Amino acid sequence: MVHLRRSLAPYWWPIPRKAGGVWVVKPSPGPHSFAYSLPLAIVIRDVLRYAKTLREARYIVSRGYIKVDGVVRKDYRFPVGLMDVIEIVPTGEVYRVVPDQDRYYNLLPIPSSEASLKLLRVEGKTTVNGGRLQLHFHDGRNLITSPDMGAKIKTFDTILYDLENKTIKTHIPMKLGVVAVVTHGSNVGFSGKLYEIVWTLKRRQSVVGLKKGEEVRRTILDYIMAVGEESPVIKITP
């Protein structure tokens, strides 16, 4: 089924609930889950407003005018999510999907120099042939690394990934003192210094504390992403 009822769409989608018909585009299976992604058609029509209708949005996508993470996507239902880089080919505009305190996820304009850079959170590691380690990231991407590099990078760490050259540019460990941003939950979009980690048996449910000035927020480890040692390594805020 390629559509779903508007009333059942994630609450943060920027669509009218009682206007525009009963149905809305449903994201196709892809790198991000349904609850935390937007189909390209809605990005084009309702967020960027390059189209007035779904038909116009489908045409724009089908012409190959939209790149996601450096790859032309022609599926109007393709799901875009956290930290994805969206490029409008004819205009050269580049956007990053970032956590936002008002809109949950929002498109942030970024310089073209950052079009090939993406933050990826490590969700797990496995050993493959030859003793090398394969890293698994939040967007479904996998990367095989040398044993030495793989040993340094832990689950919940973040890497700055070069989409064009498919290489790791920076490794940001999940540790006290780093700058992190909340990616899910009621505190989504808040960023600050990680000053506390209360480890629990289920590591993903460990309680963490972030501080920015006098403001303090608490959430769980599974809901944050490290974005820099002293400051974010790429643009994630206006």
From Swiss-Prot:
Superkingdom classification of source: Archaea
CDD domains according to UniProt: S4 (cd00165)
Ribosomal protein recorded as keyword: yes
One cellular component term from this protein's GO annotations in UniProt: cytosolic small ribosomal subunit
Keywords per UniProt: Ribonucleoprotein, Ribosomal protein, RNA-binding, rRNA-binding
The S4 RNA-binding domain, residue ranges: 38-100
Pfam families: Ribosomal_S4e, RS4NT, S4
Annotated SUPFAM superfamilies: Alpha-L RNA-binding motif
Molecular functions (GO terms): rRNA binding; structural constituent of ribosome
GO biological process, one term: translation
HAMAP family from the UniProt entry: Ribosomal_eS4
Sequence similarity: Belongs to the eukaryotic ribosomal protein eS4 family.
PANTHER family assigned: 30S/40S RIBOSOMAL PROTEIN S4, SMALL RIBOSOMAL SUBUNIT PROTEIN ES4
NCBIfam families: PRK04313.1 (NF003312)
Protein name: Small ribosomal subunit protein eS4
Organism: Pyrobaculum arsenaticum (strain DSM 13514 / JCM 11321 / PZ6)
Gene designation per UniProt: rps4e
